Amino acid sequence: MDSQGRKVVVCDNGTGFVKCGYAGSNFPEHIFPALVGRPIIRSTTKVGNIEIKDLMVGDEASELRSMLEVNYPMENGIVRNWDDMKHLWDYTFGPEKLNIDTRSCKILLTEPPMNPTKNREKIVEVMFETYQFSGVYVAIQAVLTLYAQGLLTGVVVDSGDGVTHICPVYEGFSLPHLTRRLDIAGRDITRYLIKLLLLRGYAFNHSADFETVRMIKEKLCYVGYNIEQEQKLALETTVLVESYTLPDGRIIKVGGERFEAPEALFQPHLINVEGVGVAELLFNTIQAADIDTRSEFYKHIVLSGGSTMYPGLPSRLERELKQLYLERVLKGDVEKLSKFKIRIEDPPRRKHMVFLGGAVLADIMKDKDNFWMTRQEYQEKGVRVLEKLGVTVR
């Protein structure tokens, strides 16, 4: 709460999950899937203790997804379907989740780097016109991640469900000209795992199975440190084989797929995506920065988002960065490699890093009125109020 007794809400709308709660808290109050579903056929009115409605959102939609036509309002971190997005926000602020009177609250929202201006304008418009929040602030996700880590300068590798961003931040300001985006993230890895399991003879082709495979991925997948070695183990031994019990009681065996699926992050061609993988993209981003800032960036690489949770990811990133630095900067001179300092921070709570940073920032700002865009300012200026965030509005 701020000094006037208004609640300060923090809402991190991801492509896959919504994380929402209050300023100053150290964990989201609610985490639920960012999906909206509509029944395919209305034959029953109840499944278990869930009532089937014309519009199902979040947890309920996820549980009944086999009976629904499901839509994710966000794609690659950007809102694609505003009507469904409003349903998602109604659910977030309504009695099912936060249960707040939006007119007497302030809200801090997060946005991906390189978010189109139109997208940001529309979000502010909806927050003031539909929900009538008293104050709104929009923060860039990568900057919040660094705040949560207690840093002002660093490179954030943020990989969620819909998109992966590599975003350098200097003295608290994100550098859009250096920000890179890779359209491979959690959802693509899950799809690829479905494909790999199909080759093993397990068919997961229904949208309801998607959730099951996501759970298999979270439980069993890891990033291989040395791919040749992993492939040898997968082919010649059964060391990697793990059993997994499906919701219907069947047991499946998963082997080499455990490291093959996340490998798409490093080798996008595996899932027919052009371009370089996450390690090379990170290297290119840092090398494109001003020469004086590079060493700071190499020493403060921060991982964030659910798709950076794979065991083995930090060490593989470090290995590839060292290799690239040796080949392209030192031209193979191994002697000089010992001077190359690199540090990859993988905080244990990185899945909710953006929310945590948002909760910290909102708490610091709660009584500083000059930071927030207010409803009154919006009524006077319209979307030009965004200039207050230091954003140029065309």
Curated annotation (Swiss-Prot):
Pfam families: Actin
GO biological process annotation, one example: meiotic cytokinesis
N-acetylmethionine modification, residue list: 1
Protein origin, superkingdom: Eukaryota
UniProt entry tagged with the keyword Cytoplasm: yes
Gene Ontology CC terms, in alphabetical order: actin cap; Arp2/3 protein complex; cell cortex; cytoplasm; cytosol; lamellipodium; nucleus; podosome core
Family membership noted in the UniProt record: Belongs to the actin family. ARP2 subfamily.
Chief site of localization: cytoplasm
N6-acetyllysine PTM positions: 299, 322
Subunit structure, as described in the record: Component of the Arp2/3 complex composed of ACTR2/ARP2, ACTR3/ARP3, ARPC1B/p41-ARC, ARPC2/p34-ARC, ARPC3/p21-ARC, ARPC4/p20-ARC and ARPC5/p16-ARC.
Annotated protein name in UniProt: Actin-related protein 2
Localisation: Cytoplasm, Cytoskeleton; Cell projection; Nucleus
Keyword Nucleotide-binding annotated: yes
Annotated function: ATP-binding component of the Arp2/3 complex, a multiprotein complex that mediates actin polymerization upon stimulation by nucleation-promoting factor (NPF). The Arp2/3 complex mediates the formation of branched actin networks in the cytoplasm, providing the force for cell motility. Seems to contact the pointed end of the daughter actin filament. In addition to its role in the cytoplasmic cytoskeleton, the Arp2/3 complex also promotes actin polymerization in the nucleus, thereby regulating gene transcription and repair of damaged DNA.
Gene3D superfamilies: 3.30.420.40, Actin, Chain A, domain 4
Molecular function per GO: actin binding; ATP binding; cytoskeletal protein binding; structural constituent of cytoskeleton
Binding, ATP: 160-162, 214-218, 305-310
